[in-house]
Design a protein with these regions (language model features):
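Charged helix-capping and loop-helix junction motifs
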Residues: 2, 64, 177-181
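Residues at alpha-helix caps and immediate loop-helix transition turns in enzyme cores, especially N-
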Residues: 2-3, 150
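Active-site phosphate-binding/coordination module
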Residues: 3-105
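Conserved acidic, metal-coordinating active-site core of Asp-based
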Residues: 74, 78, 85-187
C-alpha cells in the first residue's frame, strides 16, 4: 500500500511511471496500469515497450520463430517446462502445467502460472503452426545442475541473452532485449 501511495505522489508531481517487468503486459496489476501517470510499460525483460493507453507494442526486440524452435529443441533434452511469451501472453502445454510440482514451484506461483498461461496441446506445434515470434521463452527446470548445463548451452548462442528471476528458471530473450535499453529508447 505504501508503494502505491508513492506512485500516486509521482503521478501528482507529473512524473511518468514506467512499470518494468519480466512478465507480459497482462501481468501488470490493473491498479498500476490504470494510474494516469503510467502511459508506457517495459515488459518481458525489455523485449516490449508497450503503450498502455492504446494497448499496443511500440517497440519490440523478439526471438524469431526459428530461434524459438531452436531453444525449445535444446530445452527438451532436459527435464524442463517451456513457456514462450507470444503477443503478450505465455503459452504452455499440459505436460508442463500438469506437473508444476516437479519444478519446485510454490502453490502461489502455480496459481499465478495457471492464471496467466494459455494452454495449447503442444508448444512446439503451436510455434511451428503460427510462425510467430516470441518476446521471451521462460524455462522452469526440475534439476538445478541441469539448469546450469542448459544455461551454458544457451549462452553459447550469441543472439541470446539469458537471465533468471527465480532459482529454478531461465529466461531467454533476444540479445538487446533488456529493461535498461528499453528505458533508454523510451526516454
Amino acid at each position: 500500500q505504501g508503494n502505491y501511495q508513492a506512485l500516486k505522489e509521482c503521478e501528482k508531481a507529473g512524473i511518468q511511471i514506467v512499470p518494468a517487468t519480466g512478465r507480459g503486459v497482462g501481468g501488470i496489476p490493473p491498479m498500476i496500469r490504470e494510474l494516469p501517470g503510467a502511459n508506457y510499460a517495459i515488459t518481458t525483460n525489455g523485449a516490449v515497450v508497450a503503450d498502455l493507453k492504446n494497448n499496443k507494442a511500440i517497440k519490440t526486440c523478439g526471438l524469431s520463430n526459428e530461434m524459438i524452435q531452436r531453444i525449445l529443441n535444446i530445452a527438451k533434452k532436459y527435464h524442463s517446462a517451456t513457456d514462450p511469451f507470444i503477443d503478450g501472453r505465455a503459452i504452455t502445454e499440459p505436460a508442463s502445467i500438469d506437473h508444476m510440482d516437479e519444478f519446485g514451484l510454490s502453490p502461489e506461483m502455480q496459481k499465478l502460472i495457471r492464471d496467466t498461461r494459455e494452454v495449447v496441446p503442444s508448444v512446439m506445434e503451436y510455434v511451428k503452426t503460427t510462425g510467430a515470434e516470441a518476446e521471451k521463452v521462460n524455462i522452469f527446470m526440475a534439476d538445478l545442475e541441469e539448469r546450469e548445463v542448459l544455461r551454458k548451452e544457451l549462452m553459447a548462442i550469441p543472439e541470446l541473452s539469458i537471465s533468471s528471476s527465480m532459482y529454478n528458471n531461465l529466461e531467454v530473450n533476444a540479445k538487446g532485449a533488456d529493461k535498461g535499453s528499453a528505458l533508454l529508447w523510451l526516454a
